[in-house]
Amino acid sequence: MREQGREGSSFLSQQLGPTIEDVMDLINSDRDVISSPSVFVCEDAPSSILSTVTVAHYVPHEQCPSTSWAPQREGPNPELNITEQPKQRGMRFRYQCEGRSTGSILGEKSTEHNKTLPEIEIINCDGLEEIHVIVCLVWRDPPHRVHPHGLVGKDCHNGICEVTLNPQNGVAKHSFSNLGIQCVRKREIDSAVNERLKLNIDPYKAGKWRLHEEVDLNVVRLCFQASCTGPGFKYDIPPVLSDPIYDKKSTNTSELKISRMNKEYGRCEGGEEVYILCDKVQKEDILVIFGEDKWEARADFSQADVHRQIAIVLKTPPYHDLHITEPACVRVFLQRITDGIRSEGMPFVYMPRVKDPNGVHSKRKHRDCSQLGDIGDPDPHGIEMKRRKVRPSYADHLIPPYPDINLPLMDSFNHNEGYHDLPLMNPDEDAFHFLTEDPHFSDLLTHDPYFLDGYSNQFLPDQVNGVTAHLVGSSLALTDEEQPLPDCAFNDSGCRR
């Protein structure tokens, strides 16, 4: 039956062509055909079995026509170069609701007094009529997918920038002015990317991101594409990427800057406390470096010493040479741990070591010199001088505060009766009779004149002169009779009571 079936199948194969069984028999007998070609005899030629397979003719790679040029252009191909990169840090990405108050992307050579812009140059443009340039934003890292943030400003629409250049003398240059970066919210990321892809804005044909990938919203790159057209041909220049541009408001990518330091010098042994005011930093991602050309050291501080991301309290590291004899100037930097970015350096001076920081030796030397100078003094320790000091008495306030001013002589007061006479004591007899009848005034009028001789001169300082004593005595006297004062009361040589 099997043979009859095979005969029947052979008959059908002649009528309908090769069957699946014939193909399997051909595959299984391939080894036998190689070892002994005469073993297998096919009723039909292999060409009849594979007659339905079409094989294209091989064309060498050198003979393939170019898809960029039609026809081929003589000379080197055009090239796009970035003559000035955009400034990487210092620009803040703005939302659409914030407007365009932040300015534009500056060039890397820009300074406070001289503003520059990103610039491109296209060379080998001989014979080209115009060049169409498209600028878009892509990821920082490969595969450089389209970024959801967009460009805004002059010649910008739908998040991209388009300009048309006319080359002159085989070269085309262009500076991008008033070009800003507009960021999107997280809920708008998907729609922004889909809009770019619909416009066929995908320089590296990377498509949309995968589910496990995450978009970095704090950093972008500018991607420049150029399409050159001429008489009867067109050429697309490969895309060129700029340096990364970081968002200023993000502490993970922002520019590092030291605003102020409370000390600009310190001991070479280190360990001194220094306060640094800076822009916002991440306390777990920041270092403070003291260094010069061939030496660097880290300052000592912890995360708790970073106050509100804008102040750092640290201790200075020791200088590598503790035996310096002259001040050594170094620089102080802020350094981010993740990307190694550093701030501009601030000067700091290490001072030589002080041999006697507490001044013990200088004090001892001064004391020794003073003792040597007092060897010939009869009272080297000042004991007798202390004994001669007099206690302050009640008359100390009589000493004039300004010794250069001399008091007037008492003779001038003797001729002016108003200075030592009572207002009611006048030659009027009625007034005198009135005073004598009063017991209080009668005792005063009959009392003996007051003299300073009744007071011991030990209560008077040596500085009180005769004029002052005469003035006091005249003030105490209540009579109009002038009482002379003895000279011996103020003479240290003789009279003592």
Swiss-Prot record:
Gene3D superfamilies from the UniProt entry: Immunoglobulins, Rel homology domain (RHD), DNA-binding domain
InterPro entries assigned: Ig-like_fold, Ig_E-set, IPT_dom, IPT_NFkappaB, NFkB/Dor, p53-like_TF_DNA-bd_sf, RelB_RHD_N, RHD_CS
Keywords of this entry: Activator, Biological rhythms, Nucleus, Transcription, Transcription regulation
Region named Disordered: 359-383
Localization, UniProt: Nucleus
GO biological process, any: response to cytokine
Any single GO CC term annotated in Swiss-Prot or TrEMBL for this entry: nucleus
Kinase keyword on record: no
Ranges for domain RHD: 78-393
Family matches, as PANTHER family: NUCLEAR FACTOR NF-KAPPA-B PROTEIN, TRANSCRIPTION FACTOR RELB
Protein task: Does not bind DNA by itself; probably associates with a p50-NF-kappa-B homolog to act as an activator. Could be involved in hematopoiesis and spleen development. May play a role in the regulation of the circadian clock.
Protein name in the entry: Transcription factor RelB homolog
The organism of origin for this protein: Xenopus laevis (African clawed frog)
Gene (UniProt): relb
